[in-house]
Regions:
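Carbohydrate-binding surfaces of carbohydrate-active enzymes
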Residues: 1-154
Length: 154
């Protein structure tokens, strides 16, 4: 990791005497190395670069937990998006999940039972940058997970 950071940003990350570093390439790819990343500095970077996360949770609906979190993995395959969302807390979480873009035919896949159900309770919301998110209501039991599967609208 140290070698990669040194190659990409020209710094030695084991040293304390550097500031945040930013880089870009000919294909308009951008890199950021934040010396002391916090939720606030990441949110500021996303705002400055006009980035939106693939997925966001309504933080106000997630009970504070001493251990555990809501986590996710997002993969795309054959034109469909697969989100595996896990609740590692000791409480059932009822939350709104925002997926970047407009989705058709959303389904909930329960990996514990094999049950697949259509998600009918969703809505589109326009964002300040003109893009959209699809908001869905989810209840995820304690220490479990669910797949949300869908295809983005054209």
């Amino acid at each position: 990791v140290v070698r990669l950071v040194t190659e990409m940003f020209g710094i030695d990350p084991s040293q304390e005497s550097y500031s945040d570093k930013f880089n870009s390439n000919a294909n308009k790819g951008r890199l950021a190395f934040l010396h002391n990343p916090t939720p606030e500095t990441l949110a500021d970077l996303f705002t400055r670069w006009e980035l939106r996360a693939d997925i966001a949770f309504d933080e106000s609906t997630i009970p504070p937990a001493q251990i555990g979190y809501l986590n996710y993995i997002h993969k795309q395959k054959e034109g469909r998006d697969f989100y595996y969302i896990t609740n590692t807390t000791g409480n059932t979480v009822h939350t709104t999940v925002s997926l970047r873009g407009k989705f058709d035919n959303l389904e909930s896949w329960n990996p514990h039972t094999g049950k697949i159900e259509p998600i009918r309770n969703f809505e589109f919301a326009k964002q300040p940058d003109g893009g959209y998110v699809t908001n869905i209501k989810l209840s995820i039991p304690k220490v479990s997970g669910v797949f949300v599967v869908g295809k983005m609208k054209e």
